[in-house]
């Protein structure tokens, strides 16, 4: 039998293709699952065909049984339905009215919504249209304007069947085409019928990888772009991860990034916390399990193809356990460390890590007399507060990638049974004690799903140029350097997922355990330091005076 975590999972935390190991998904408390629906598999030979075995009902039934919401992603045009390339070609008849039988895409949407209504009510329309052919990974061969038409027809046809369907923009990589979303919105907002239909989408989807601090930066930039066009849409991070290149069970001779197994685990803890603090409505890891992984490809899975679990799986369990129920989140970023505070009502979780190779000794305001300090493998100890604070030394980051410290150091959770935000922010010791260089706070509200009006005849769109008056900041991506040979690395054994109290001891990873120090006797120490300093100054002055007077 599948043993799930106590209580229903927090729906905000998801995993792509969690159905591939439903036992592990239930144990880890996965809240939502993204499943690919290939049009070319559903109807491989013609519009009258329907292959229900493409996505077996058992996947959907197990998800429902364990409280996982399923989000569908539709893509991949069959040969019979396009005049363009198979897979990425624009569907035939897309420019026809949504009710025209020759609009093959509209027909598919109505069929899909009818089959899965009540079981899948969130649909992502295609994948990564911002990757232009022939760039590796491209999936859409149409123009940006044609993608808007694809989205619009999908939304109109879906709401003909069910007004409760939520339509998502395709996940965007951002760094392939930084201005894609801005140009898309500029075009969409020129559609005369768009405003009353929310421009035919409810949610913006993002794919963010490798660099921890890119997560809040891209979310904030996306929110600013939406606001520039008068829109306030939820933002989901549908894919995020930092795949390791040093797993001895999946060696890679060349890799684009230098990332250890432990850094993959750190990345998840950091990126999920930062996504919450930036206001993301949901976050999901790509992906759950490495199925059919070709040799030399990056192993994104939290679970290997043989069902053994990487350290990142244990980190994910910490997320679903200690981030669940967050009602507000705050990021305080300092030169040497980052602190994310998650207000969970009766509980408060602080997520801490070093940003550079240097150790960071951090004082954290206490909300209670004691707290649980948990490392990223799940080992924990109880620490006592003194003088209204805790003091923790965070190990420095590995920073082995050519781009620098793309992932912070080993990540620690400080969990207190106390409600409310802390009275003050954490600081590094001895410096800086000033305000953090970045502070972001968001209140997290329950998801709302806006039902769009019933579809109406679609007006003819006239493409317009992107407005030049709106200039928004963009993040310049770092170019990927030439791959270098992967250094030999012997990772630590994957710890068990059960959190067990342990006495303070060196962690089983190359990074040291945090040094927990409690301030005591600070007044007497200060007096002694002053006296010693005065005596030393007097001695130095005496020597100088004797030399000046020739004695």
Predicted features, each with a name:
Residues 384-426:
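C-terminal beta-strand-rich structural cap/linker in extracellular carbohydrate-active enzymes
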Residues 528-551:
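C-terminal membrane-anchoring or membrane-association module
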Residues 245-316, 332-334:
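Aromatic/acidic polysaccharide-binding cleft in carbohydrate-active enzymes
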Residues 85-201, 207-224, 246-270, 299-306:
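Active-site cleft segment of glycoside hydrolase catalytic domains centered on the general acid/base Glu
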Residues 2-8, 421-518:
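Ser/Thr-rich, Proline-interspersed low-complexity disordered segments
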């Amino acid at each position: 039998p599948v043993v799930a975590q106590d209580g229903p999972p927090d729906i905000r935390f998801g995993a792509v293709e969690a159905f591939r190991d439903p036992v592990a998904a239930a144990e880890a408390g996965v809240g939502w699952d993204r499943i690919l629906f290939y049009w070319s598999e559903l109807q491989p030979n013609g519009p009258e065909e329907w292959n229900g075995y493409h996505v077996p009902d058992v996947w959907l039934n197990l998800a429902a049984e364990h409280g996982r919401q399923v989000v569908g992603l539709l893509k991949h045009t069959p040969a019979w339905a396009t005049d363009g390339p198979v897979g990425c070609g624009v569907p035939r008849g897309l420019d026809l009215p949504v009710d025209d039988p020759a609009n093959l895409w509209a027909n598919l949407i109505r069929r899909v919504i009818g089959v899965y209504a009540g079981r899948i009510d969130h649909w992502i329309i295609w994948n990564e249209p911002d990757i232009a052919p022939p760039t590796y990974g491209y999936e859409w061969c149409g123009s940006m304007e044609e993608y808007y038409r694809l989205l619009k027809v999908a939304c109109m046809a879906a709401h003909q069947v069910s007004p409760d369907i939520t339509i998502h923009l395709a996940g965007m990589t951002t760094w392939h085409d930084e201005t894609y979303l801005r140009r898309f919105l500029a075009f969409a907002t020129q559609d005369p019928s768009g405003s009353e239909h929310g421009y035919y989408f409810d949610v913006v989807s993002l794919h963010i990888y490798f660099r921890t601090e890119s997560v809040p930066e891209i979310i904030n930039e996306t929110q600013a772009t939406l606001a520039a066009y008068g829109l306030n849409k939820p933002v989901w991070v549908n894919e995020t991860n930092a795949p390791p290149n040093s797993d001895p069970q999946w060696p890679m001779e060349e890799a684009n990034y230098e990332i250890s197994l432990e850094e993959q685990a750190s990345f998840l803890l950091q990126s999920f916390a930062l996504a919450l603090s930036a206001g993301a409505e949901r976050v999901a890891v790509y992906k759950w399990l490495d199925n059919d992984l070709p040799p030399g490809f990056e192993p994104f899975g939290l679970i290997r193809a043989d069902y053994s679990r990487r350290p990142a799986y244990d980190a994910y369990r910490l997320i679903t356990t200690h981030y669940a129920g967050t009602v507000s989140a705050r990021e305080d970023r300092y030169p040497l460390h980052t602190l994310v505070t998650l207000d969970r009502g009766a509980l408060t979780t602080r997520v801490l890590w070093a940003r550079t190779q240097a150790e960071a000794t951090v004082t954290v305001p206490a909300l209670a007399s004691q707290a649980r300090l948990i490392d990223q493998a799940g080992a924990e100890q109880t620490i006592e507060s003194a003088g209204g604070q805790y003091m923790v030394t965070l190990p420095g980051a590995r920073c082995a990638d050519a781009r620098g410290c793309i992932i912070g150091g080993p990540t620690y959770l400080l969990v207190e049974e106390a409600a409310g935000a802390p009275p003050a922010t954490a600081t590094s010791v001895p410096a800086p004690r000033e305000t953090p260089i970045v502070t972001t706070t968001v209140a997290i509200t329950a998801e709302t799903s806006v039902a769009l009006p019933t579809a109406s005849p679609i007006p003819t769109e006239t493409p317009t140029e992107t407005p030049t008056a709106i200039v928004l900041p963009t993040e310049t991506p770092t170019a990927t350097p030439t791959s270098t040979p992967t250094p030999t690395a012997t990772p630590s054994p994957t710890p068990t997922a059960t959190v067990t109290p342990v006495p303070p001891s060196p962690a089983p990873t190359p990074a040291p355990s945090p040094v927990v120090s409690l301030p005591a006797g600070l007044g007497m120490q200060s007096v002694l330091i002053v006296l010693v300093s005065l005596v030393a100054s007097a001695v130095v002055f005496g020597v100088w005076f004797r030399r000046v007077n020739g004695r």
